[in-house]
Amino acid sequence: MPYEWENPQLVSEGTEKSHASFIPYLDPFSGEWEYPEEFISLNGNWRFLFAKNPFEVPEDFFSEKFDDSNWDEIEVPSNWEMKGYGKPIYTNVVYPFEPNPPFVPKDDNPTGVYRRWIEIPEDWFKKEIFLHFEGVRSFFYLWVNGKKIGFSKDSCTPAEFRLTDVLRPGKNLITVEVLKWSDGSYLEDQDMWWFAGIYRDVYLYALPKFHIRDVFVRTDLDENYRNGKIFLDVEMRNLGEEEEKDLEVTLITPDGDEKTLVKETVKPEDRVLSFAFDVKDPKKWSAETPHLYVLKLKLGEDEKKVNFGFRKIEIKDGTLLFNGKPLYIKGVNRHEFDPDRGHAVTVERMIQDIKLMKQHNINTVRTSHYPNQTKWYDLCDYFGLYVIDEANIESHGIDWDPEVTLANRWEWEKAHFDRIKRMVERDKNHPSIIFWSLGNEAGDGVNFEKAALWIKKRDNTRLIHYEGTTRRGESYYVDVFSLMYPKMDILLEYASKKREKPFIMCEYAHAMGNSVGNLKDYWDVIEKYPYLHGGCIWDWVDQGIRKKDENGREFWAYGGDFGDTPNDGNFCINGVVLPDRTPEPELYEVKKVYQNVKIRQVSKDTYEVENRYLFTNLEMFDGAWKIRKDGEVIEEKTFKIFAEPGEKRLLKIPLPEMDDSEYFLEISFSLSEDTPWAEKGHVVAWEQFLLKAPAFEKKSISDGVSLREDGKHLTVEAKDTVYVFSKLTGLLEQILHRRKKILKSPVVPNFWRVPTDNDIGNRMPQRLAIWKRASKERKLFKMHWKKEENRVSVHSVFQLPGNSWVYTTYTVFGNGDVLVDLSLIPAEDVPEIPRIGFQFTVPEEFGTVEWYGRGPHETYWDRKESGLFARYRKAVGEMMHRYVRPQETGNRSDVRWFALSDGETKLFVSGMPQIDFSVWPFSMEDLERVQHISELPERDFVTVNVDFRQMGLGGDDSWGAMPHLEYRLLPKPYRFSFRMRISEEIPSWRVLAAIPETLHVEMSSEDVIREGDTLRVKFSLLNDTPLSKEKQVVLFVDGNEYSVRRVVIPPFKKEELVFKVEGLKKGEHLIHTNLNTRKTIYVR
């Protein structure tokens, strides 16, 4: 006979039928939890014995006579790995043991035995007594007073036992034996830590002999979504009562008004009573307006309360509707996880999660990949979040082939059905739940089909979701079309045809490490085309465990950090918040893209405000506008705007007189009063518009500049600043300002970035390795300099591996300014470029940075919608985000200028017109070498990156997808320039030293050719200035555009272009360009 923990047809023994959750009850008026009078919490310390397997526990451990005085104590709820027993194991797909379903390891099956003596009051024995386990992983036996009661498997739904006949007044012994591995483990392969133990609440409660066993509340709305209907099923159970009892049902409105709906006398028997009630114009429940009604049910002494809401979920013409309005799923996936408690998540942590989600415009959470604690759903009802409730089924490590998958094996049918049914029965009254999800990545087959058909009969008020069906095409038994990580062309293809089902991305925007690029691009498509209804980002929280290294430094641990094998490393670090719920930069982008107010510029002073909320008028928010001049607020005003959901209103802004500065208009909406999830003033939506681009002033510099040279160095002195260049390397080696050394290392061209997790997934370190070499192995090909009256230009030419070329020019002016110019001419056969810029280090004393550009958090080419143009100031140590696995971090995009300061001296850098930059208190090599944030050393320097740009982050997935094409630095010529100055004050960023702008262009070709010959038109472009020139040369033949070529001409260099013109007919032809060159040729 197989063991009970290795038989999927045995799902439980001795347990009660599933029912709706009633304990504790969340009072929607006070926000407090209520417990019944006859209630004993068994949370707290239990005696605990840990064994290698179930065969190594003492034979009579459940006996009342057994002496457990030398056992340890353990907290319940908890995961025993988090208390030092066994090791945490993280895998994504593979099982931690050799899969052979339904069998699990015999010798290595960690087992925990829990014992606790409890006192039962004597008056309880007039009633029925139940023991409730909300969650035990993965299999457990129960003994009471030495008698075996039963067992249960599903780790994420309750197991409840009737104990009336085995308990006695006074002292009683509860014994629980928990096995880490069971056949149930094959259905719990859910990309998370493999923990074990009694990790959710445990309690005893008593009910009258004749009591309400279950309640099912359903609501509907009429065709106008105005009036409502309540459908109520009350299941009563009699275990020995002989007298009739009064059943009373009372409706309590969100305003606290009470109305009796039912009052009748019922016989003491097992039965279900069904009722229907009409409610005129009830307040509707939604994530925006979570109006909760209460049904108070009394049967004699038994009283139960159920929160519910009036709402309707449906599909019409392929569109997902909620209370008649098209619903966008602006969601995240969430694992139940705490860095200190594992899966034993506290209510405080749940509330923290929900408030953060609401504050960042998230409206949906998918309980990936199992039913959560019951309190989570109460809180989602109360605060307002849509929930995709997912059954505790994932068999990812088993082949999904129809002949192999557990979803098609008859012996696994009961296990699938039991888990899905237990979820539905427990959670069926929560208005926040809009979809039942059958599971995740568990193949497709008849076991899911049967469960889905049962749901449709049991609950017709919600939709059924299961992504696994789409792997074999659409399935009739699910209501929505769901995919994971689809590329945008798949969305566009789906939207191009008439569809019956809405498209939901149950997982998208894989947020591993520094990620979630191009989120706005996805939502531009979603909001433009039909049938597309959003999705849930993977995922909410980095599953990193708080740990200390050998030096006592804290870090977030991931797979492999506990000696666990097999493991999947940091693939559990996919969140938009850190393990302690510190927001990651991605979360700010999510908030911006998910916002429900759209603002568009209609004319210079008129703006269209569109209300994209479904049930909220914009009058609920305070509007405000600000005008920023060069990043500083110069005018601001508040306003109110009345706009019903879906309406648009025009907003007129009185604009000031504007000089040559840069001006931005910022329009925002914030909460006008406190809510349960955020305080008054919390910004829910904003947009920023460029009112006027800056005008740069070109100023002649009259101050002189000196030049000295020796065998190794070239020294340029201007005002109080000295620039030292190496003749051996061609680099700017040192800057001295009033004899203070500014540089700790030379200014070097840099084409590499520390790989992100997405980069590693698409093999960027291997594919683009030549650019890492280019940053280190450049060879100085040529160096020359030129002194003029008010400036010195130092020009270096470098050859890079792969035969690419870099040209750098430093032009030092008499006022101390230096213009830095870089041209990159990649070879034809090199791959795309990770980054284009310069890198250098300065002393650690330069520990404060100010900038004008996007902020305050980090932004990147494809993740910068949330970056607000303004002036900012931070400590260098605050400029990076501490990703769990160190990687590229801290970039600021579209920066006009930045300045590093040591309190006296400022290193000022301004773009021409803009740059990206980042600063780190360590080196790039440090960042790339270490695997945990605690390993980053303390350095006596600050690394400074001044960049044209780096490629986007991507995020479609983290196992192969590259940044979208429009966010990649393809191998073609690039140029960029910036200005640098060392001074005591921040200079004007819009005043530049005047330099020649001349570009000499010559065009030549044959004067006469024969018909059929090719005409070769040659252009020579001489750049005799210290700045690179980028030109687009357009060739016209007889007034018609013939060809376009782009060229970058480095400083002091001549470039040649040759156009070939074919097919000229006999006669005279005019050849000219957009560069004011022309020539007439003749064809014979």
UniProtKB/Swiss-Prot annotation:
Keywords: Glycosidase, Hydrolase. SMART domains: Bgal_small_N. The keyword Plastid does not apply. The keyword Hydrolase applies. One of its GO terms (biological process) is lactose catabolic process. GO terms for cellular component: beta-galactosidase complex. The active site is at 441 (proton donor), 507 (nucleophile). One of its GO terms (molecular function) is beta-galactosidase activity. It catalyses: Hydrolysis of terminal non-reducing beta-D-galactose residues in beta-D-galactosides. Its EC number is 3.2.1.23. Belongs to the glycosyl hydrolase 2 family. NCBIfam families: betagal_LacZ_Ttogales. This is Beta-galactosidase. It comes from Thermotoga maritima (strain ATCC 43589 / DSM 3109 / JCM 10099 / NBRC 100826 / MSB8). The gene is lacZ.
